[in-house]
């Protein structure tokens, strides 16, 4: 089959052309807006409230596809399954899919109060665990986040508030600004407030249990489904009043699943290490592999890339660099 032979020839290339750029997948959401277009320059379907741009994803029902270059048209899963060591580097085991998922979230309205199940609970409920982090690209003056419970709130208090429709009063909330970050481990109840534009780095999972949705209707005009029993089984009721992530030098968040660093570039810098790195442009414009990337752009630098230099095009350009442990 000629198509298969062509694919095999491209995947057998000894040196990948850096960087790899993928087509974003835009998701309509009841809470979405248009800032992916107005602030980041992404082309959206007119009149649609886009809440999520999936920038890098390898799931059965959603695949990132290489946008340009010699590997154009190949999926992230094809690269992962057939050129894992070359593109992604050593030590990544035999997982069937790329382990992370990268999104941009545009919250014109509040997201639901929700939780992602810890691994032990996810297995019992038939879901997937999801630990994630948020990096705030842009926020309105009165924007806030919800994360964890207020101190002293018990499970009984929470269930009573659920019954009374006042659960938001039991959740810790705080103001937020551009440049802040928040770590959301599995089991932490959370919600994103209106006015936030957020980069989300997460485990490759799409399991979310909604516990409260602000009594609103979905895109179909009906109340969105809630998952109260699953949420109660997943919430860590000892998780009280977490704080905004406190950077350790350039490291914004480091956990067992990923490491995210903020680089502010006054001069060119080499991305070293044995494996791949995913770059998200936070401010300004950068250049890599002869291509320029503006705010909101994502690219994957392969493990076997020969040109690993990230250059600032505009003074003080800033990127979020995400890697996995051991690389």
Model segments located where?
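Transition-metal
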Residues: 4-153, 213-237, 260, 326-327
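Ligand-binding loop in jelly-roll beta-barrel domains
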Residues: 97, 105-110, 118-119, 128-129, ...
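His/acidic/aromatic-lined binding-pocket segments of jelly-roll/cupin-type domains
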Residues: 102-103, 111, 132-135, 173-174, ...
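Short, basic/aromatic beta-hairpin or loop at an interaction surface
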Residues: 151-164, 272-280
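Loop-centered beta-sheet repeat module
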Residues: 161-206
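Short acidic-glycine-tyrosine-enriched beta hairpin
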Residues: 171-182, 289-305
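C-terminal amphipathic alpha-helical segment
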Residues: 207-276
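Short beta-strand segments in beta-sandwich/barrel cores
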Residues: 268-269, 284-288
């Amino acid at each position: 089959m000629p198509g298969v032979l062509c694919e095999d020839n491209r995947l057998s290339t000894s040196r990948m052309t850096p960087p790899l750029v993928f087509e974003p997948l835009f998701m309509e959401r009841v809470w979405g807006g248009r800032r992916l277009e107005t602030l980041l320059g992404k082309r959206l379907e007119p009149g649609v409230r886009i809440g999520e741009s999936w920038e890098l994803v390898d799931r059965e029902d959603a695949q990132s596809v290489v946008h340009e270059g010699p590997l154009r048209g190949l999926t992230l899963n094809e690269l992962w399954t057939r050129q894992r060591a070359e593109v992604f580097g050593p030590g990544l085991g035999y997982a069937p899919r790329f382990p992370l998922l990268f999104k941009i979230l545009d919250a014109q309205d509040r997201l639901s109060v929700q939780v992602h199940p810890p691994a032990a609970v996810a297995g019992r409920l038939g879901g997937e665990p999801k630990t994630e982090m948020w990096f705030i690209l842009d926020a309105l003056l009165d924007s806030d986040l919800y994360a964890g419970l207020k101190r002293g709130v018990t499970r009984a208090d929470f269930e009573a508030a659920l019954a009374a429709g006042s659960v938001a009063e039991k959740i810790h909330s705080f103001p937020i600004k551009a440049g802040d970050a928040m770590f959301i481990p599995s089991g932490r109840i959370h919600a994103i407030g209106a006015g936030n534009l957020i980069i989300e780095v997460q485990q490759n999972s799409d399991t979310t249990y909604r516990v409260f949705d602000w009594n609103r209707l979905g895109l179909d005009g009906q109340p969105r489904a809630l998952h109260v029993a699953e949420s109660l089984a997943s919430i860590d009721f000892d998780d009280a009043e977490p704080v905004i992530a406190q950077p350790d030098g350039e490291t914004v968040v480091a956990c067992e699943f990923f490491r995210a660093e903020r680089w502010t570039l006054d001069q060119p810098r080499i991305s070293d290490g044995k494996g791949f790195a995913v770059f998200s442009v936070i401010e300004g414009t950068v250049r890599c592999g002869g291509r320029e990337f503006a705010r909101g752009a994502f690219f994957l630098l392969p493990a076997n890339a020969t040109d690993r230099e990230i250059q600032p095009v505009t003074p003080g350009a800033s990127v979020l660099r995400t890697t996995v442990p051991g690389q």
